[in-house]
């Protein structure tokens, strides 16, 4: 093959990966190429290529088929991580610079894109052909050989293999054959190529890529950029909210390292934070706006422009709003982005300006404890600042694993200091978690959903031993005894009489609780006495034990313990509940007033899709109206994976969303083709935090704000949700109101920051530009102690409850007259708990937990983190032995809702009778249905997505998620 033949072939391949229509025109005009492709060559119709050809092309190379991934970039082909814009990309760019090549930026692709590599080789050939002496020619020949060996050979072979595997098209297979011939693995051309059928291939210079170099000569070398440091911060729903330094060069991310944050704050990232670039700069990114062309869930789309995406959304919104009213519109729960300019705020503001939308209350994280806390204290803010833990004499971490979940960037360091001081730390959890290993003096395993029984028995013991704080109970609470009851509630329904069996005939002794919880009675007595005697003592719950079918009652039981012992509102104590701390005000994107008054529990959105018009205040605890007037017909699902992956009973949700007569439009944005995005009608490829400026608030606790500075430009054709809603708001004539009269996103963010700073001068926020350089730490902040004012001055500061006191017994709950919502705290067995007769069929309990390698579903695509912490089912040796299972076996976990096939870890770090599976793995269904009768209509998940097995059984009061209350069986595959 001579150099002109190679140049011609490389020009053809450049055109193929750049503009396929131009390529086909070239082929059609060159007899040799036309002969090679023969009848397989696509034919033009009305000046365009056939739609089926263009769809097939986009499926292979543009990401419109969710099941096809071909790595098209040297960085992804030459590493195990599949990262974009890494050191490999930088090497490619610097090679371009050395020889004066100006990369084209083909369709938003990174510079090491396969088409760009082919074009660079064309450029080098053109430079060689332009050279007048052999020495100069050899420079460019050597450069081409070295570049090919270092980058293009592997990239081309990987791409050719991907084409051959994913496509049956003879035309595409011949393209793959041409690539294999040009870049043979063993040095010999593959048979049946254009070089065999058309030796001496050549065509006119104007069809050769970079042919202008023949006249102009090589471009001068370009200077290399020096590396620089960008300070930024993560914005997903992570308990850490850390600060990181990004080393960038030539638009490539070379490293992420710890940044202590503004003013020396300890905001160091964990392994997740240091791997952000490996998560987000992944070749499987969504690349272009798309509209669904197949059935929902099939993952088949067609590429569209931003204008077409806005057109589609505008048309669907107008059509559905006109037909069903604003109550058919809904912004789904999702917190993949929690920064100031997060997309859910943008969407809510837009909808509120155009008629309103159905709203939601609560969160999947804590809705049940939120309800319990609000009814008991009249406020959600029941937590103390982490620093106050240093004042406690005794700590119970109840269903709490801050070593993994972080729970505020300061929490882990404070707990480490507390342990070093010698303060006793107890952890109550079905699992021997990371926090047990790192912090606990004692691990108390407990059967899931029985925490309320343990709380009852501890309260009974404390009262029986005379360790209760009677002054606190009488002064600040109602409901502990008959003499202190809220108005309208019979005196006999007090908590004391419940504990002592006067109400139901069952005394809540430790022996009673042992049979329910699996916790020995002596252990219950010991920790009850220790907790009550150690004042100040802190009972610090996590959120896992309230994500059960009886989660509200569990939370109320733990609150009752803190009040019984007088540990509320004092340094070193703790009020339990949902635990949020009101430290400093935080900026937010104002959604404005929603003209539509209907509000549902965040967990009930699928019910609102199915039968929203039947949902009522009494039955479904909707707010704002007595009965909804519409089903959900339009969903914005933005930066969230709750549409499928994180909602209970995935197979039920899939079936519901596949019925397009129910929800008629789903417009969604994300960085990846997540399981939820596969069910979208409109797909918007969003930029990651590494590509966009923003402002980040701390997670739950924190005296600071963090700047989020873009490290690189948005990859591919990423669409900022702000730009999308800007265009949409212009279509509906509300842009000025929506944007606060700001012309663009950057100025809007600055406006919101400066408005917030002006509203809160005591925070001492710096000018915007200086803030974006380093962020800001607030000065002189005192630790927040929940309800300290009410405890110090009860006559001046009253609780925001009907009685003005802590309502251990609630008149509001009594008025509901629902046996599943008692007026007093107390253990209630729940569906699929350990006492459910269904255990005869599905004998094992299954809980989820937060793994250290993921933040919900974020990072599940990160190969490095998966290697560090693979997805496994935890099962106790006793349960494994009964089923012939050994460590590392692939097992099937199943119940009537579905099945999962995954490897197991046989470990005594889980209670007998209980299994555990980390939440957040991306739902990946098998293409086959399981053998046998169990769940035969549903394909098994192959990645360990726990919500295949969780049930849609809303809790009685909050109508929240019970996703840690599941019964399953496990068998060896």
Please state what every model-predicted region is.
Residues 208, 721-771, 857-859, 863-873, ...:
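Long, contiguous, secondary-structure-rich segments that constitute the structural scaffold
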Residues 199-467, 493, 498, 638, ...:
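N-terminal export/assembly segments and adjacent metallocofactor-ligating motifs
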Residues 386, 690-714, 724-725, 729-731, ...:
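Glycine/threonine-rich phosphate-binding loop and adjacent beta-strand/alpha-helix elements that clamp
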Residues 1-205:
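Surface/interface-facing alpha-helical segments and adjacent flexible terminal/loop regions used
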Residues 458, 483-613:
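Active-site phosphate/pyrophosphate-binding segments
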Residues 292-308, 465-521, 711-809, 846, ...:
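N-terminal leader/propeptide and maturation segments of large enzyme subunits in energy/redox metabolism
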Residues 233, 429, 655, 661-665, ...:
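Phosphate/diphosphate-binding loops
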Residues 344-423, 427-428, 453, 515, ...:
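Extended redox/cofactor-interaction regions of prokaryotic respiratory oxidoreductases
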């Amino acid at each position: 093959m001579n150099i002109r033949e190679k140049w011609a072939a490389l020009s053809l391949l450049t055109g193929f990966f750049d503009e396929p229509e131009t390529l086909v025109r070239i082929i059609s005009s060159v007899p040799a190429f036309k002969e090679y492709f023969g009848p397989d060559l696509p034919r033009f119709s009305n000046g365009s290529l056939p739609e089926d050809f263009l769809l097939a092309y986009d499926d292979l190379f543009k990401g419109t088929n969710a099941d096809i991934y071909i790595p098209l970039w040297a960085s992804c082909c030459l590493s195990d991580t599949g990262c974009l814009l890494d050191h490999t990309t930088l090497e490619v760019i610097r090679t371009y610079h050395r020889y004066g090549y100006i990369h084209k930026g083909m369709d938003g692709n990174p510079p090491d894109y396969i088409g760009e590599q082919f074009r660079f080789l064309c450029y080098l050939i053109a430079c060689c052909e332009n050279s007048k002496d052999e020495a100069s020619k050899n420079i460019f020949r050597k450069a081409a050989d070295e570049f090919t060996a270092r980058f293009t050979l592997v990239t081309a072979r990987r791409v050719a293999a991907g084409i051959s595997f994913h496509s049956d098209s003879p035309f595409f297979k011949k393209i793959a054959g041409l690539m294999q011939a040009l870049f043979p693995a063993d040095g010999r051309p593959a048979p049946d190529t254009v070089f065999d059928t058309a030796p001496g291939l050549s065509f006119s210079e104007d069809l050769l890529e970079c042919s202008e170099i023949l006249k102009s000569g090589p471009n001068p070398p370009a200077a290399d950029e020096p590396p620089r440091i960008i300070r930024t911060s993560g914005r997903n729903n992570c308990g850490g909210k850390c600060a990181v330094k990004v080393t960038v060069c030539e638009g490539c991310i070379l490293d992420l390292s710890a940044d202590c944050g503004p003013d020396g704050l300890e905001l160091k990232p964990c392994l997740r934070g240091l791997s952000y670039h490996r998560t987000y700069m992944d070749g499987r990114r969504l690349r272009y706006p798309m509209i669904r062309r197949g059935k929902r869930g099939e993952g088949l789309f067609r590429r569209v422009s931003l204008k077409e995406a806005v057109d589609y959304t505008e048309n669907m919104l107008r059509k559905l709003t006109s037909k069903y009213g604003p109550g058919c519109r809904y912004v789904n729960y999702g917190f993949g982005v929690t920064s100031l300019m997060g997309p859910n705020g943008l969407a809510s503001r837009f909808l509120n300006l155009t008629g309103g939308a159905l709203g939601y209350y609560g969160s999947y994280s804590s809705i049940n404890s939120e309800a319990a806390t609000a009814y008991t204290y009249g406020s959600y803010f029941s937590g103390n600042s982490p620093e106050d833990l240093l004042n406690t004499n005794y700590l119970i971490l109840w269903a709490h694993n801050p070593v993994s979940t972080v729970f505020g960037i300061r929490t882990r360091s404070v707990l480490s200091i507390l342990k070093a001081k010698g303060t006793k730390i107890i952890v109550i959890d079905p699992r021997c978690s990371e926090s047990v290993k790192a912090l606990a003096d004692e691990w108390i395993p407990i059967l899931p959903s029985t925490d309320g029984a343990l709380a009852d028995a501890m309260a009974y013991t404390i009262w029986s031993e005379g360790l209760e704080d009677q002054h606190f109970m009488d002064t600040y609470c109602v409901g502990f005894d008959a003499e202190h009851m809220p108005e309208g509630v019979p005196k006999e329904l007090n908590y004391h009489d419940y504990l002592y069996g006067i109400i139901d005939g069952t005394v809540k002794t430790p022996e009673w609780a042992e049979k329910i919880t699996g916790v020995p009675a002596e252990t219950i007595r010991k920790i009850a006495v220790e907790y009550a005697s150690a004042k100040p003592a802190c009972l610090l719950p996590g959120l896992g034990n309230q994500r059960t079918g009886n989660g509200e009652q569990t939370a109320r039981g733990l609150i009752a313990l803190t009040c019984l012992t007088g540990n509320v509102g004092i340094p070193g104590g703790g009020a339990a509940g949902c635990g949020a701390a009101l430290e400093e005000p935080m900026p937010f994107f104002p959604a404005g007033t929603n003209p539509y008054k209907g509000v549902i529990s965040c967990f009930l959105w699928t019910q609102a899709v199915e039968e929203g018009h039947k949902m009522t205040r009494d039955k479904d605890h909707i707010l704002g109206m007595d009965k909804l007037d519409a089903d959900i017909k339009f969903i914005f699902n933005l930066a969230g994976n709750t549409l499928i992956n994180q909602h209970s009973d995935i197979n039920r949700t899939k079936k519901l969303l596949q019925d397009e007569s129910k929800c008629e439009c789903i417009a969604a944005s994300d960085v990846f083709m997540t399981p939820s995005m596969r069910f979208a009608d409109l797909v918007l490829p969003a930029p990651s935090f590494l590509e966009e400026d923003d402002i980040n608030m701390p997670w739950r606790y924190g005296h600071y704000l963090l700047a989020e500075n873009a490290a690189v430009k948005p990859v591919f054709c990423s669409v900022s949700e702000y730009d999308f809603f800007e265009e949409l708001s212009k279509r509906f004539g509300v842009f000025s109101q929506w944007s606060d009269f700001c012309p663009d996103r950057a100025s809007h963010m600055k406006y919101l920051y400066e408005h917030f700073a002006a509203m809160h001068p005591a925070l001492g926020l710096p000018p915007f530009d200086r803030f974006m350089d380093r962020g800001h730490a607030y000065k002189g902040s005192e630790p927040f102690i929940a309800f300290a004012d009410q405890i110090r001055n009860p006559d001046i500061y009253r609780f925001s409850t009907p009685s003005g006191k802590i309502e251990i017994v609630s008149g509001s709950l009594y008025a509901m007259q629902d046996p599943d919502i008692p007026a007093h705290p107390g253990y209630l067995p729940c569906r699929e708990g350990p006492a459910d007769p269904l255990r005869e069929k599905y004998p094992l309990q299954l809980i989820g937990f937060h793994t250290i390698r993921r933040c919900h579903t974020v990072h599940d695509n990160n190969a490095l983190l998966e290697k560090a912490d693979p997805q496994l089912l935890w099962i106790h040796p006793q349960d494994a032995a009964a089923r012939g299972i050994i460590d590392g076996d692939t097992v099937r976990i199943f119940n009537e809702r579905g099945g999962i096939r995954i490897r197991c870890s046989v470990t005594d770090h889980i209670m007998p009778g209980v299994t555990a599976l980390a939440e957040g793995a991306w739902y990946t269904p098998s293409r086959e249905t399981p053998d046998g009768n169990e769940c035969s209509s549903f394909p098994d998940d192959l990645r360990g997505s726990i919500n295949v097995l969780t049930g849609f059984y809303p809790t009685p009061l909050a109508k929240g998620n019970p996703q840690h209350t599941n019964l399953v069986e496990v068998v060896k595959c």
